[in-house]
Regions:
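Glycine-anchored, exposed beta-strand/edge motif detector
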Residues: 1-142
């Protein structure tokens, strides 16, 4: 087995947008001329695999934490929810300020589209709270 040149724990990744005023939101990996960069998710079904720990200016090095089911993370919530609620990316397409936040599937209306499932809430939460989340991955269509 060859597992050289791998990394564990927090990573320093180049930003593809100004993330200097953000933390505790999800960011997704993208290709920029052959370079891995992270930005807040551009679509509701993007693969937002990292929690932003410390943001940075465009082209700077942001500290991100890869999500793993082995470790809970805290992510900024959009709206309220309950323990056990499935969490998906908030609708950052309609409201840019919500990019990278999570919301409960229970709050989605029928026919609203496909969303990236990112975790399960492990506590009661309200809008703007850093909700304790157990990461999981998938898609939810409503």
């Amino acid at each position: 087995m060859s597992q050289s040149n791998t990394q564990e724990g927090d990573l320093l990744l180049t930003t593809g947008e100004d993330l200097s005023t953000y933390a505790d939101v999800l960011v997704a990996p993208y290709n920029s001329s052959g370079l891995l960069v992270v930005t807040r998710p551009a679509a509701n079904n993007d693969y937002a695999l990292y929690v932003l720990v410390y943001g940075a200016v465009p082209g700077g090095q942001a500290t991100v934490r890869p999500m793993s089911p082995n470790r809970t993370v805290r992510i900024t919530a959009k709206g309220a929810g309950n323990p056990g609620d499935l969490l998906v990316l908030a609708d950052g397409v309609t409201t840019a300020a919500d990019r990278g936040k999570v919301r409960s599937v229970a709050g989605l209306t029928s026919g609203s589209g496909t969303y990236r499932l990112v975790g399960v809430a492990e506590e009661l939460f309200v809008d703007g709270q850093l909700v304790r989340t157990r990461p999981t991955f998938g898609s939810v269509t409503v």
